[in-house]
Each structure stands twice: as structure tokens, then as C-alpha cells.
């Protein structure tokens, strides 16, 4: 059982360690002109793509889903680009650099949620939905209440994730490029706005694809050079790393980072089910033509991400060997210059010189841009499509809906920049964990049960969904991170760091209880409509494909 809990603790990197890769203290570096030039090349190229995409965005379908004309392979790359963050690249390699084998367990944890998406969600989601996951959740339930709940769940997740990314972006750019924090945050905000405002999903998709290719190429080159150094022998790699690491052979033993099994289980469940409830990831399944391409998307994305996280393990051990043992990368106190999160960046310099260092720094920045662009589009679609067009202004024209979407992009952008500046010196690592917990406690139960449970009713979905969302937020506030570290109280009311285990349970129990006890005529009608929904979800009959999507 202990080993199972240890494996489930794989969620830790994203919600804590990896998030902390770009939220902890940073030491500003000298201006890196190679990195700045390479980043400018990336920006000019992607802005060119945005201009090209803007000429092809003529309808609501084009803006939200790129007309449904993205292939499974392209979408798989874009999903990988949307999901592989700078935090995972720098944070996981730093975790391997400091803790060895535990980093592998943690890096593989990023993949745990994807089989659920592949086998349970991707096909039915594409067959039932159109632009957002709320289309699926409200297929046979009452449109208004369900869309409001889904939009609120999406916006809270997007806001928390976006703040974490913006603060992380500012600190990472300060770290890598030597630019001022506030300039960095504004720069990310402006570029994010331009990609989404003018190019919609088509530009966002290609930015994510390019970023994924660059990141995979950079990580592959680093791993290749590390393995070349040890004669392509993993035995030599591990032997040399153990010889120079302060912990010695202990870096090859698991379990050093897992203390509390309840927190480990809670965090593991948060990542597993949270991944399947992230709105910017779910939105990507509507960019392909049919369910077959949706399945292929997940298959390719999982392959790309699995390959990448294995590379981070090699990069981390390479950093132990080539960076940790090299005094040139240490300060006077013997600590790594810029902190442990610079391990992968220093390794880039060690294996490829200053030019490759510039390339990796630029890729890290590109990584952030790709993630925030996807988040912004997901947030804008929740407001314009779910709330405006289907709740507050039913019958709105496509033009009106797109106008609201673009206004929302501007508002989200300004809010993200302001909050990025305000949260500069705050601990933002908990925000990513809370985003996953809310996605797992609100979005995921409603999506899953709306597609699979015939007895679900609007009353059950509403009460259970809101209970899950509020439980996650309240328990997070009462937990050690916010109640003690941020608010300064002596002892936490809720003893565990992450609430997913409890909030997911509350959500599922609430949905089950309030649906099972719903004997209204409306509830019975919704149950009767499940068969028609089931046939549509299995066959795709009635789904519009391609540009008319």
C-alpha cells in the first residue's frame, strides 16, 4: 500500500515542486542577448502565423475550434505543447537533480490522468460537444444552471492557473534573460493577447505545436549529449551521478519526498482527475473532425509527453554529473547559481555552449506563451459561448458572440497582468494545486457522470458540483499553505495540504444523493433522454464535421 501511495504522490511536482520551480526565490541573471535574439525570432515567426491565421478566422467555429480541421497528429502535438509547462521542464529536472530517483516517479505522475481521458472522455466528448465541455454537460440537462456552473468552474481554474503562469513567467524571464519582472509580465500579457485576439484557436494551436517541437528537440539534444558523455550507458550515468551527488547511493532509492500518505493520495487524485477537467485541455478535442481523430490526439499527446518526461529524468542526472560537479556553475557559498531550478539551463550551457543556452532559455519563454494562450481562449469561450450566448443573451448572432469573446480576452489579459504584478512576492505554488483540485472536484464529476450515468439530473449536478467546488476552495483556505503560511495563523484547521481526496468525494456523493432523491417531472424527463444521448455519444450520429463543425 505504501508503494501505491508513493506512486500516487507523483502528482506532487505539478502542484508543488514543479510549480515552485518558477515561484520561489530567483537570482537575476545578466542580460542574455543570445536568448533574447532567439526569442525575438520565435515571436516574429509566431506573430506571422497569427497574421496568417487571422485571415482564416471567419466564423465562430474558426475562432473556437480552428474549424474542426486540425488532424489528430497536429492536435496531439498541440495538447502536449499546452500541457508541458516551463515548471515541469525546469522543476522536474531540478527535482531529479536534488533527489534522484524520486524525480522519475514524480515526472511519470504527469501522465497518470491521460489514460482516463483516452478511454473514458475523448470519444464521447467530441461526439456530444461543439465548443466547450459545457456543451456536453448540458446536452440533456437544463442549459442555464449547468452552463453557469461549468463556466464558473472553468473561469476559476483558468484564473488560478493564469496567475501562477504569469507570476512564473515574470520570475523565469528575470532568471533567464535578466529582464525586469514587471516588463516580463507585461510582455507575456501583450503577446498572449495578440495570439488569441487575432488568431483564435488556429494561431494558438500552431504556437503550441511549434513550442512542443522546439521543447522536444531541445530536451532530446540535451539528453543525447548527456548519454554520449557516458558512452550511452545508463549504468555509467547512474554510477557517475552517485559518485558526485552529496546523497551518494541514496539518490537511487524512492520514497524520500513522501511523508504523509493522505496528502499524497489527495494530491494524486487531484492530478489524475484534474487533468481530465482542465478546460483548456478539453477544448482541444473540439478542434478535430471526429471521435477517431480525438482518440488519436490523446494517443499522440501521451506519447510525446511520456517521451519528454523520460528525457527530463536523463537531463536531471546529467545535471548532477556535469553541473553539480562543476565549480563554474556554483556561487561562493557552493550553491547552484540562480538556484536548483537553473539545473537544466546550466546543463544546456554545459553540453551546447552559450548559443544552445540561449535556445533553451527562449524555448522556456515560448513554453509559457503557449500555455497562457490556451488558458485565455478557454476562459474567453466560457464567458462568450456558455454565459453570453446560451444564458444571458440566447439567440445572439455569431458576430455578437465573437465580439464578446474578444472583449473577454482583453479583460482577462489586463486582469492577468495586474494580478501577475500584485502576486509577485506571494507563494503561488498552491494555486496550481487548487486549480487541479477544482477541476477534479467540479468539472470532472459533471463531465463523467453526464456521459455515463443515466440517473443524473440537473438538481444533482448543480448541488453536487457546487459542493465540490466550494469544498475544494474552503479546505484549501483552511489548510496549512493559506491558513498558516499566508494568513499567519498558528495552526491549520484542515491539516492536509491539498483537498482533492475530500472535495472529489463530496462532489460525487452530492451528485449521487441529490440525483437519486430527485423525483420531479423534470428529473424523470432528463433520465429518459439518456438513451438518445448515449447513442449519439457512441456513434457520432448528427455530429457536424470539418469547417461546419
Swiss-Prot record:
Transmembrane segments: 33-55, 76-98, 103-125, 146-168, 183-205, 212-234, 261-283, 303-325, 362-384, 404-423, 428-450, 462-484, 494-516
Pfam families: SSF
Membrane topology (Periplasmic): 1-32, 99-102, 169-182, 235-260, 326-361, 424-427, 485-493
Signal peptide start and end residues: none
One BP term from GO: sodium ion transport
Membrane topology field: Multi-pass membrane protein
Gene Ontology CC annotation, any one: plasma membrane
GO molecular function, one term: symporter activity
Cited InterPro entries: Cation/Ac_symporter_ActP, Na/Glc_symporter_sf, Na/solute_symporter, Na/solute_symporter_CS, Sodium:Solute_Symporter
CDD domains according to UniProt: SLC5sbd_u4
Key words, A-Z: Cell inner membrane, Cell membrane, Ion transport, Membrane, Sodium, Sodium transport, Symport, Transmembrane, Transmembrane helix, Transport
Locations listed in the record: Cell inner membrane
Main function: Transports acetate.
Family statement: Belongs to the sodium:solute symporter (SSF) (TC 2.A.21) family.
NCBIfam families listed in its UniProt record: PRK09395.1, PRK12488.1, sss, symport_actP
Protein name from the UniProt record: Cation/acetate symporter ActP
Naturally occurring in which organism (per UniProt): Salmonella typhi
Gene that this sequence comes from: actP
Amino acid at each position: 500500500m505504501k508503494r501505491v501511495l508513493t506512486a500516487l504522490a507523483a502528482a506532487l511536482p505539478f502542484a508543488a515542486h514543479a510549480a515552485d520551480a518558477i515561484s520561489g526565490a530567483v537570482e537575476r541573471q545578466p542580460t542574455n542577448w543570445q536568448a533574447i535574439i532567439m526569442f525575438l525570432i520565435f515571436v516574429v515567426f509566431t506573430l506571422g502565423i497569427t497574421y496568417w491565421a487571422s485571415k482564416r478566422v471567419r466564423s465562430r467555429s474558426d475562432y473556437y475550434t480552428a474549424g474542426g480541421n486540425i488532424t489528430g497528429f497536429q492536435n496531439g502535438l498541440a495538447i502536449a505543447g499546452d500541457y508541458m509547462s516551463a515548471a515541469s521542464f525546469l522543476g522536474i529536472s531540478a527535482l531529479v537533480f536534488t533527489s534522484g530517483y524520486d524525480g522519475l516517479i514524480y515526472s511519470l505522475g504527469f501522465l497518470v490522468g491521460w489514460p482516463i481521458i483516452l478511454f473514458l472522455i475523448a470519444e464521447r466528448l467530441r461526439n456530444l460537444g461543439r465548443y466547450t465541455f459545457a456543451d456536453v454537460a448540458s446536452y440533456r440537462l437544463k442549459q442555464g444552471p449547468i452552463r453557469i456552473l461549468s463556466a464558473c468552474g472553468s473561469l476559476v481554474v483558468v484564473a488560478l492557473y493564469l496567475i501562477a503562469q504569469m507570476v512564473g513567467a515574470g520570475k523565469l524571464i528575470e532568471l533567464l534573460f535578466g529582464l525586469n519582472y514587471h516588463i516580463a509580465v507585461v510582455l507575456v500579457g501583450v503577446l498572449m493577447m495578440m495570439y488569441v485576439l487575432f488568431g483564435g484557436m488556429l494561431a494558438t494551436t500552431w504556437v503550441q505545436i511549434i513550442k512542443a517541437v522546439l521543447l522536444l528537440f531541445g530536451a532530446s539534444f540535451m539528453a543525447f549529449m548527456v548519454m554520449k558523455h557516458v558512452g550511452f550507458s545508463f549504468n555509467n550515468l547512474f554510477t557517475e551521478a552517485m559518485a558526485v551527488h552529496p546523497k551518494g547511493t541514496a539518490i537511487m532509492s524512492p520514497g524520500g519526498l513522501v511523508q504523509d500518505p493522505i496528502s499524497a493520495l489527495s494530491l494524486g487524485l487531484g492530478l489524475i482527475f484534474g487533468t481530465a477537467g482542465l478546460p483548456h485541455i478539453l477544448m482541444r478535442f473540439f478542434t478535430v473532425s471526429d471521435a477517431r481523430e480525438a482518440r488519436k490526439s490523446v494517443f499522440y499527446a501521451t506519447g510525446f509527453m511520456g517521451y519528454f518526461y523520460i528525457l527530463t529524468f536523463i537531463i536531471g542526472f546529467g545535471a548532477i554529473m556535469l553541473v553539480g560537479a562543476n565549480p563554474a556553475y556554483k556561487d561562493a557559498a557552493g550553491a547552484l547559481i540562480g538556484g536548483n531550478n537553473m539545473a537544466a539551463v546550466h546543463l544546456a550551457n554545459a553540453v551546447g555552449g552559450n548559443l544552445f543556452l540561449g535556445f533553451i532559455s527562449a524555448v522556456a519563454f515560448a513554453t509559457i506563451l503557449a500555455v497562457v494562450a490556451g488558458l485565455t481562449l478557454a476562459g474567453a469561450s466560457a464567458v462568450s459561448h456558455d454565459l453570453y450566448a446560451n444564458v444571458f443573451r440566447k439567440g445572439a448572432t455569431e458576430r455578437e458572440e465573437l465580439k464578446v469573446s474578444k472583449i473577454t480576452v482583453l479583460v482577462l489579459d489586463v486582469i492577468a497582468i495586474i494580478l501577475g504584478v500584485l502576486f509577485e512576492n506571494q507563494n503561488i505554488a498552491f494555486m496550481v494545486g487548487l486549480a487541479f483540485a477544482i477541476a477534479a472536484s467540479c468539472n470532472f464529476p459533471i463531465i463523467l457522470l453526464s456521459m455515463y450515468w443515466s440517473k443524473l439530473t440537473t438538481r444533482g449536478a448543480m448541488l453536487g458540483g457546487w459542493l465540490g467546488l466550494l469544498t475544494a476552495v474552503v479546505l484549501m483556505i483552511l489548510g496549512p499553505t493559506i491558513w498558516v503560511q499566508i494568513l499567519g495563523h498558528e495552526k491549520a484547521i484542515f491539516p492536509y495540504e491539498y483537498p482533492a481526496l475530500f472535495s472529489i468525494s463530496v462532489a460525487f456523493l452530492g451528485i449521487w444523493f441529490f440525483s437519486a432523491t430527485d423525483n420531479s417531472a423534470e428529473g424523470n424527463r432528463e433520465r429518459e433522454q439518456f438513451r438518445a444521448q448515449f447513442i449519439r455519444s457512441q456513434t457520432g450520429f448528427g455530429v457536424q464535421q470539418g469547417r461546419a463543425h
